[in-house]
Amino acid sequence: MPRTPPYPEIVADLGALLGLSRPAGQCFAAIWRAARPPCADDLTAGLGLSRSNVSTALKELRDWGLIARARAPGDRKDYFTAPANPWEIVRLLLSGRQRRTIA
């Protein structure tokens, strides 16, 4: 039986079909499934991506409206959250794709 690819890789492939970069798809999957909002350092360590790849991916995800920044009291780091509703995510992906197709 073939091994199922890890969840971030599946989301990265789906995101690439809609115009997201692979690192953005991986970061989104990690943010969406995280028990607590991760920071960029958490994503770098957990996904094995470079800090610059993660930073670029986070900017791309913010531009698409797929993630939001959050701050923890007393902490200077930015943490990231994603919509919990899968239908909201689909809506954001499709509207982002449409904006990029028309532009």
Where in this protein do the model-derived segments appear?
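Short acidic, hydrophobic short linear motifs in intrinsically disordered regions
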Residues: R36-D42
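Glycine-centered, phosphate/nucleic-acid-interacting loop/turn motifs that mediate DNA/RNA or nucleotide
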Residues: G65
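Short, Lys/Arg-enriched N-terminal segment that forms or immediately precedes the first helix
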Residues: R3-L17
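Short beta-strand "wing" residues that participate in macromolecule-binding interfaces
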Residues: R69
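A short acidic, leucine-rich amphipathic alpha-helix
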Residues: D42-G48, L61
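Pre-recognition alpha-helix immediately N-terminal to the DNA-recognition helix
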Residues: Q26-A29
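Short, cationic-aromatic polyanion-contact patches
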Residues: L17-P23, C39, A72-L93
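Key DNA-contact positions within bacterial/archaeal DNA-binding proteins
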Residues: S52
